[in-house]
Amino acid sequence: MAASTSGYSGVLFRLRKYANKSQSLCHIGNSNFIIRTTWTTGCKHQHQLNTQIESLPQMVGVVGLEIHAQIHSKSKLFSGSHVSFSDPPNSLVSHFDASLPGTLPVLNRRCVEAAVLTGLALNCTINKKSLFDRKHYFYADMPAGYQITQQRLPIAVNGTLSYSHFEGRKRNHVVTKSVKIKQIQLEQDSGKSLHDDERSQTLIDLNRAGVGLMELVMEPEMCCGEEAGAAVRELQLILQALGTCQANMAEGQLRVDANVSVHHPGEPLGVRTEVKNINSVRHLAKAIDYEIQRQMEVLQSGGTVLNETRAFDSKSGITIPMRDKEGLQDYRFMPEPNLPPLFVYESEASVPAGADSTQLVLIDRLSSQLPELPSVTRTRLVETYGILREHSFTLVNEDGLVDYFESVVKMTKTEPRKVIGWVMNELMGNLNLQNLKVSQSPVSPCALAEMINLVRSGHISSSTAKKVFQEMWKTPEKTVEQIVKEQDLWMINDKEELRQICQRIVDSHSEEVQIIRGGNKKVLNKLMGEIQKETKGKTNPLQVKAILEEMIF
């Protein structure tokens, strides 16, 4: 790669600060504007290399991902030890986890079923026979000196993941792409090394050692941080829908390694770097965009990109070297002698004679258990309720929000597109403000539906309903009607009372009335505003307008 770019080493280019704009490295053209500037929140990454390169020959980023998803299971992959994130250190360690001599692995069926389910959801081919291997490491948090994995013949191969991200200044243009899944393999997690800087020592916690992982390898078909982030977010939603992984990145249940390189289209891929253990989608996108731009600048200055492992520093927004990978590490893969081949079967008809099918993993049985996947849910929401596509993404992205929305719709005759406004603006606004989950909302779907029904029936106005919602949020023990009664928020629907109010306003604004009679009907809005102020928003604007026009004209 260095040789192919040496001809460009003398090219002069400027680095220009680009304030308040994010940069997308997804597409790099050969015009003056090499890096396309976007105004989206999805790729809003500012870092030390936040620059725009001009007069640069065409170059693109290439991104592949390796994702380690911790299987949601009560016990570990090869032992009966319990799985928990918050238990005291070294309290969940069996003899096998600690690699005591004479202990043997016993495969957890739940982990196999989770891998098959995930493979089916990602359109993979499930291998009826897969094999286990030993991958040798010499790390203190892996006491056996090796990891049991599936290097030769993994449980699932050749899948695809479709994902979407938004483009455009208003984030309303949905772009859908797909990436190939090379393989899904079962393997053990390692323990944790906890560094104590004050005492200059490293402590080992083996609670995580032996926990079941699915390693998903995505082909290098993405081109920027936004695409990679969208793919990982979609995978998170799929795993959570399946129940095969809780996918909480903050707790290490989903860890991502990004393989990043740059090259000129039509030429071989460049030397790649691996950015390890990224623990959030936002950091993933930032790390990839930084690394792509860093490599471009290295090549443009006549340097060579090293094949190395790097870490992302979230505080400074840069990647830093960890260890050199130029010398290919020999993991000394070998077949796992203590585990036979793993067989799964298509259906009961393919089960060997005399075998108990209830004790076997059947693909068609698991296929029948597949839930509605996020992409299908989004399509259904748009087609069934007529909501905007971007709203369907928000509903699906928030755990429990689809059920909340559909419950409200069922309990009210109001158009779903009006219901979505209350859910997106009032409900989500308050949840985000207080950093709460949907399940923690003090306003239940039933209460919100009751309030929306009062608006629809004309008993309270939309502006009043917003005040009522805030009271419902503060005092969830009160019903909607209690709040409306206590604060006297019922709409004034009595025509005689409305006429009296309108007459008072007309009498006290004689100058405005003359202007209106002179042909300037816009001033009528001022009188309507005065009435709304006097009644605290408890009048119907259409009714008020009709009465005022009758009185004035």
Curated annotation (Swiss-Prot):
SUPFAM superfamilies documented for this protein: GatB/YqeY motif, Glutamine synthetase/guanido kinase
Its EC number(s): 6.3.5.-
An example Gene Ontology biological process: mitochondrial translation
Highest taxon listed in the record's lineage: Eukaryota
UniProt-recorded Gene Ontology molecular function terms: ATP binding; glutaminyl-tRNA synthase (glutamine-hydrolyzing) activity
Subcellular location: Mitochondrion
Gene3D superfamilies: 1.10.10.410
GO cellular component, one term: glutamyl-tRNA(Gln) amidotransferase complex
Family: Belongs to the GatB/GatE family. GatB subfamily.
Subunit and interaction comment: Subunit of the heterotrimeric GatCAB amidotransferase (AdT) complex, composed of A (qrsl1), B (gatb) and C (gatc) subunits.
Protein name: Glutamyl-tRNA(Gln) amidotransferase subunit B, mitochondrial
Organism field: Danio rerio (Zebrafish)
Gene from which the chain derives: gatb
